[in-house]
From Swiss-Prot:
Subunit architecture: Heptamer of 7 subunits arranged in a ring. Interacts with the chaperonin GroEL.
Biological function: Together with the chaperonin GroEL, plays an essential role in assisting protein folding. The GroEL-GroES system forms a nano-cage that allows encapsulation of the non-native substrate proteins and provides a physical environment optimized to promote and accelerate protein folding. GroES binds to the apical surface of the GroEL ring, thereby capping the opening of the GroEL channel.
GO molecular function terms listed in the Swiss-Prot or TrEMBL record: ATP binding; metal ion binding; protein folding chaperone; protein-folding chaperone binding; unfolded protein binding
Entry similarity comment: Belongs to the GroES chaperonin family.
Keyword terms, alphabetized: Chaperone, Cytoplasm
InterPro entries reported in the protein's UniProt record: Chaperonin_GroES (IPR020818), Chaperonin_GroES_sf (IPR037124), Chaprnonin_Cpn10_CS (IPR018369), GroES-like_sf (IPR011032)
Organism: Desulfovibrio desulfuricans (strain ATCC 27774 / DSM 6949 / MB)
A Pfam family: Cpn10
Protein name per UniProt: Co-chaperonin GroES
A GO BP entry: chaperone cofactor-dependent protein refolding
Cellular component annotations (GO), alphabetically ordered: cytoplasm
Length: 95
């Protein structure tokens, strides 16, 4: 299935966290926090301003980003968890 975000929305695939701690202990799925780091899969065309002009987004497909813990709406595409969120919910682009 293909999903194309609208306006200032961004489709992000969560990046998985480590399965074990630095001390070698394995973390069960029930104890893991959902990661707030992901990779941008697709972006919308941008937000329409009051003047009617569309402003392009700062993020692009392939960017690795940090986002708010409770950002976006969860969707499952081809069995993989993704989030659809507004660009303003993205805190930073990781270089």
């Amino acid at each position: 299935m293909k999903l194309k975000p609208l306006n200032d929305r961004v489709l992000v695939k969560r990046l998985e966290t480590e399965e074990k701690t630095a001390g070698g202990l394995y973390i069960p799925d029930t104890a893991k926090e959902k990661p707030s780091k992901g990779q941008v899969v697709a972006v919308g065309p941008g937000k329409v301003g009051d003047n009617g002009e569309r402003t392009a987004l700062a993020v692009k497909a392939g960017d690795e980003v940090l986002f708010n813990k409770y950002a976006g709406t969860e969707v499952k595409l081809d069995g993989v968890d993704h989030l659809v969120m507004r660009e303003e919910d993205i805190l930073a682009i990781i270089d």
